[in-house]
Regions:
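Bacterial N-terminal signal peptides
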Residues: 8-17
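Bacterial N-terminal signal peptides that target proteins for export
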Residues: 1-9
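A well-ordered secondary-structure block
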Residues: 110-217
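Boundary at the C-terminal end of the N-terminal hydrophobic targeting segment
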Residues: 21-25
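Short hydrophobic/aromatic segments of transmembrane alpha-helices and their interfaces
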Residues: 5-6, 26, 166-167
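N-terminal targeting sequences that direct proteins away from the cytosol to non-cytosolic compartments
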Residues: 27-31
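Short, well-ordered surface patches within globular domains
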Residues: 33-147, 190
């Protein structure tokens, strides 16, 4: 265990071939992960779309969102306006970073990491709390190590109030109001190869989603 991170998204035919060749088997692997809900599976599929071709994802999925801003207000279709911290600035920055980012290894699902993520979801469903620290002082590392041994690098991403897999991933990528942009950096980090995901209702923010990411993981 060498590093810990605990922060609180040439030719077109050639690119499509690479995505289909590498991502499709991964999608099949995700679909076989019976411990994940349909929502959680779609979050992981969306994350791997980002990693398979960050530049293409930014062009097709993020650039259109620029039209949804009215000053600092952001309006998801069919939802009430959201007042952002930075307006378009964080989104412009995200697009610029992703257009320079080379494709990354796809993330494989981990049952042990998903169990660790679910510990925090279940607790915060009861308490209404937010953040990375549990009621009895637990943190991402202690929760993950209940279920096995992680390798290389470990990080936890959490979102609140996002009721679709697409919104979960996009909000983490944009990372509005987070100066470190660690949520985005985690998604675009080549060191991460496996992930656990847990999502559920939250008493104050309607929906929450927790991701535990590691370089590798061996369940107990």
């Amino acid at each position: 265990m060498s590093q810990r991170i605990f922060p609180i998204f040439f030719l077109i035919l050639f690119s499509l071939f690479i995505f289909n060749a590498k991502a499709q088997p991964n999608i099949q692997l995700i679909q076989r992960a019976t411990y994940l809900t349909a929502f959680e599976k779609q979050v992981l599929i969306e994350l791997n779309k980002v990693r398979a071709n960050p530049a293409q994802y930014a062009e097709e999925n993020l650039e259109p969102l620029l039209k949804a801003f009215d000053g600092r207000l952001f309006i998801w279709p069919g939802t009430i306006p959201i007042k952002t911290h930075e307006g378009k600035k964080a989104l412009f920055e995200c697009i610029r970073v992703m257009k320079k980012q080379k494709p990354l290894p796809l993330l494989s699902p981990s049952e042990g990491l998903s169990k660790a993520a679910n510990v925090l979801v279940k607790e915060q469903q009861k308490t209404g709390a937010i953040g990375h620290t549990g009621r009895r002082g637990s943190n991402p590392q202690t929760r993950v190590e209940q279920f096995g041994d992680w390798k290389g690098k470990l990080a936890e991403n959490i979102t609140y109030g996002n009721n679709s897999p697409f919104r979960v991933v996009v909000n983490l990528l944009i990372d509005d109001g987070v100066p470190s942009r660690n949520h985005r950096k985690n998604i675009l980090d080549t060191a991460f190869r496996t992930i656990g995901i847990a999502a559920g209702d939250h008493p104050k923010y309607t929906k929450m989603c927790v991701m535990e990411m590691a370089g590798g993981f061996q369940s107990k």
